[in-house]
């Protein structure tokens, strides 16, 4: 099917609005993507005519809601090519998924003297949970350093592994630099040393197909809201053998088999023992609609369109004086930059006056900011609904800011 950005844009109501009297150019999808009508309508329809508490209900609404929820689990498993839908846990998002692994698998498998490997480009969500785990148990956190071009110093990776390495936790795509890491070779190396691998896929799944079986990762996690779905819902994939061994990290309803005041509690089987309490069923329904929407467009078609747009953007930005770009030439989704000596907040504020939405700040990646010795960066992110015209507006806006501020 031929990809039509105009048809895609027509599905996103917010893209028709104005900001400061100008058409909105939304270049902040890496923070959170906008939602198509199909997602909004699916969630609204569920709340209007199909809502009920899931699991254990014998009435029609409950049974139908449960079936819809579990069908989304199946759809998500197909989306990332998991072996089974029962390898997927519904979580609030990438952050909760990583914390679940750290508190369940991590508490059971990482001991004093062990080590965990991360990289210098990680989002705080893939740093802080491991720092907390290491502090709890007396383990060491090791870091793959960056190159100036935004790639990792992969030649150092073999020196970081040893017999005490329990986990490599690595981002699929950097949320600041757009760097796509060579997961296949990194995962192979980790497994050769007996370590497990967690992949933060928050910035990858919307840009091209992901196949967790081909990657052979042990854990893969992503959020719905960056994938054109609702907030407050995400997916944690865990290889089935690992998942069945992991203890729950939250207690409550839905995750138990039996509860006795005298004999204690037993857990239900995975993945449901990791889904304590009433789930975000409306969000799950919306996520299912988002997966259906993206799959119908075709991730390969989306990838081709977005890569052409990225190449155009990088070439056009060369015309902006005093613009510093961060990251490699080959990248996915994001362009981080600074303009001269001006603070990112000032540049972002001027762009907002022109109707252009970009993200400013440290992007939850303070160690990366420290590496580049800057307090903040601007970040423009390109999604499937962005256009060449919007790129031109960004370039013109930056040129105008340079003329105004010098």
Curated annotation (Swiss-Prot):
Gene3D superfamilies: Aspartate Aminotransferase, domain 1, Type I PLP-dependent aspartate aminotransferase-like (Major domain). Its main location: cytoplasm. InterPro entries: Aminotrans_V_dom, Aminotrans_V_PyrdxlP_BS, Cys_dSase_SufS, PyrdxlP-dep_Trfase, PyrdxlP-dep_Trfase_major, PyrdxlP-dep_Trfase_small. The active site is at residue 364. SUPFAM superfamilies: PLP-dependent transferases. It is found in: Cytoplasm. Its EC number is 2.8.1.7, 4.4.1.16. It catalyses: (sulfur carrier)-H + L-cysteine = (sulfur carrier)-SH + L-alanine; L-selenocysteine + AH2 = hydrogenselenide + L-alanine + A + H(+). Transmembrane segments: none annotated. GO terms for cellular component: cytoplasm. GO terms for biological process: cysteine metabolic process. The keyword RNA-binding does not apply. The keyword Lyase applies. Its cofactor is pyridoxal 5'-phosphate. One of its GO terms (molecular function) is selenocysteine lyase activity. Pathway: Cofactor biosynthesis; iron-sulfur cluster biosynthesis. Cysteine desulfurases mobilize the sulfur from L-cysteine to yield L-alanine, an essential step in sulfur metabolism for biosynthesis of a variety of sulfur-containing biomolecules. Component of the suf operon, which is activated and required under specific conditions such as oxidative stress and iron limitation. Acts as a potent selenocysteine lyase in vitro, that mobilizes selenium from L-selenocysteine. Selenocysteine lyase activity is however unsure in vivo. Homodimer. Interacts with SufE and the SufBCD complex composed of SufB, SufC and SufD. The interaction with SufE is required to mediate the direct transfer of the sulfur atom from the S-sulfanylcysteine. Belongs to the class-V pyridoxal-phosphate-dependent aminotransferase family. Csd subfamily. HAMAP family: SufS_aminotrans_5 (MF_01831). PANTHER family: CYSTEINE DESULFURASE (PTHR43586:SF25). This is Cysteine desulfurase. It comes from Escherichia coli (strain SE11).
């Amino acid at each position: 099917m031929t990809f039509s950005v105009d048809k895609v844009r027509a599905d996103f109501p917010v893209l028709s609005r104005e900001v400061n009297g100008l058409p909105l150019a939304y270049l902040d999808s890496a923070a959170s993507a906008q939602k198509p009508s199909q997602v909004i309508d699916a969630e609204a329809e569920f709340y209007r005519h199909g809502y009920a508490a899931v699991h254990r209900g014998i009435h029609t609404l409950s049974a139908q809601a449960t079936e819809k929820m579990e069908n989304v689990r199946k759809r998500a498993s197909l989306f990332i090519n998991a072996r089974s839908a029962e390898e997927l846990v519904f979580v609030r998002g990438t952050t909760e998924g990583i914390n679940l692994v750290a508190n369940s698998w991590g508490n059971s498998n990482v001991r004093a003297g062990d080590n965990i490997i991360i990289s210098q480009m990680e989002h705080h969500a893939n740093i802080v949970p491991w720092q907390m785990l290491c502090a709890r148990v007396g383990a060491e956190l090791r870091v793959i350093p960056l190159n100036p071009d935004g790639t990792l110093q992969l030649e150092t990776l073999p020196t970081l592994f040893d017999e005490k390495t329990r986990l490599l936790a690595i981002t699929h795509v950097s949320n600041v630099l757009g760097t796509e890491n060579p997961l296949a070779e990194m995962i192979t190396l980790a497994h050769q040393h007996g370590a497990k691998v967690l992949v933060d896929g928050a910035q990858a799944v919307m840009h091209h197909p992901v196949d967790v079986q081909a990657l052979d990762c042990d854990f893969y996690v992503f959020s719905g809201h960056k994938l054109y779905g609702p907030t407050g819902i995400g997916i944690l994939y865990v290889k089935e053998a690992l998942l069945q061994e992991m203890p729950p990290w939250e207690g409550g309803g839905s995750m138990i088999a039996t509860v006795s005041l005298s004999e204690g509690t037993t857990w239900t089987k995975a993945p449901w023992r990791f889904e304590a309490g009433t789930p975000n069923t409306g969000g799950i329904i919306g996520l299912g609609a988002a997966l259906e929407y993206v799959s119908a467009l075709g991730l390969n078609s989306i990838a081709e369109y977005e890569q052409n747009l990225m190449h155009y953007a990088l070439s056009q930005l060369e015309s902006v004086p005093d613009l510093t770009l961060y990251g490699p030439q080959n990248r996915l989704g994001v362009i981080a930059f600074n303009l001269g000596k001006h603070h990112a907040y000032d540049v972002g504020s001027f762009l907002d006056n022109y109707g252009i939405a970009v993200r400013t700040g440290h992007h939850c990646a303070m160690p990366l900011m420290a590496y580049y010795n800057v307090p903040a960066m601007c970040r423009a992110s390109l999604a499937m609904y962005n256009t060449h015209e919007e790129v031109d507006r960004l370039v013109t806006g930056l040129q105008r800011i340079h003329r105004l501020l010098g």
